Every structure is written in structure tokens, then in C-alpha cells.
Design a protein with these regions (language model features):
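Acidic, Gly/Ser/Thr-rich repeat motifs that build Ca2+-stabilized beta-propeller blades
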Residues: 1-155
Length: 155
């Protein structure tokens, strides 16, 4: 039986916002690794992935891709990151960015055994897209319940 969707009137929903972290400028995506650490990984448009733990940003980045990320104008730069469903065992994660040539790149990386740092030398390009325009490069990576990796693209 398919799931049933229901809507509640907005007046019945109690929503509140609380600032729990003042992240770095240009944060485009936030991900969790699903490894039980409760760390937040913040992807910044310039190509740096920062880690927040307990409401505090770590001084050292998780991964710095500024030497690979091209323009950070419009919908370009480091667009998204996602951790593999088996990240706790394999330490594999994916990033989606525009490179120095203007192409959109999906790349796989590995983290250190303790999960504290991403290894820039572990990069494996999975997909390169030559976009027809320099903007609307897309921007979201997700793993579905089926275990497949999904990415959105622009034009």
C-alpha cells in the first residue's frame, strides 16, 4: 500500500528556530556521516569542508579542495558532499564541484581511519559533466534508500 500524505494547517504546527552554530561564510551544504559521531560537515563554496562538533567549528578543515575548485561565482564551486551509507566501515564520501576548467565533477574520497580528515590524494573522479552554460551547475548529492547515489544537475 502506498504511503498516505496529509497536510496540517500551518496554525497547528509549532516551529521554532535556534541558532546552534555560526558557520563559515559561503556554506552551501551540510552533511552528517552517519557514523555515530554527530559531527556536521559543512561544504563551503570556495572548496573547504569544515567540521562542527558540539556547536564549535574545528580549526583544521576536514578537506581543502581550493586547488581543484574553479570559479565560486553563481552556482559554481564546491556544491555538495555526501557520505556513503557504509562510511563508518569504509570511510568513503563524495563531493560535487565545478573544477578549474568549468566542468562539474563528482569525485570519491576516503577519510583517515579515525574519520578526522579527508585524504586529498585519494580522489577518484567518478563523473565529469561539461555543462552547456557556466551557471546552473546543479548541486545536491544524496544516497537513496535503495543505496544508489543521486545527483542533481542544472541546465
Amino acid at each position: 500500500m502506498p504511503p498516505t500524505l496529509a497536510a496540517a494547517p500551518l496554525s497547528a504546527v509549532d516551529l521554532r528556530t535556534t541558532l546552534f552554530l555560526s558557520g563559515p561564510p559561503g556554506t552551501l551544504d551540510i552533511a552528517v556521516a552517519g557514523d555515530g559521531t554527530n559531527r556536521l560537515y559543512l561544504a563551503t563554496q570556495v572548496g573547504v569542508i569544515r567540521v562542527a562538533e558540539g556547536g564549535q567549528l574545528r580549526a583544521e578543515p576536514f578537506l581543502d579542495l581550493r586547488d581543484r575548485v574553479g570559479s565560486t561565482a553563481d552556482e559554481q564551486g564546491l556544491l555538495s558532499l555526501v557520505f556513503a551509507p557504509n562510511y563508518a566501515q569504509r570511510r568513503t564520501f563524495y563531493v560535487y564541484y565545478t573544477d578549474l576548467a568549468g566542468d562539474t565533477v563528482l569525485a570519491r574520497y576516503r577519510a583517515s581511519a579515525d574519520g578526522q580528515r579527508g585524504d586529498p590524494a585519494s580522489a577518484q573522479v567518478v563523473l565529469t559533466i561539461d555543462p552547456p552554460y557556466p551557471n546552473h551547475n546543479g548541486g545536491k548529492l544524496l544516497f537513496g534508500a535503495d543505496g544508489y547515489l543521486y545527483l542533481s544537475t542544472g541546465d
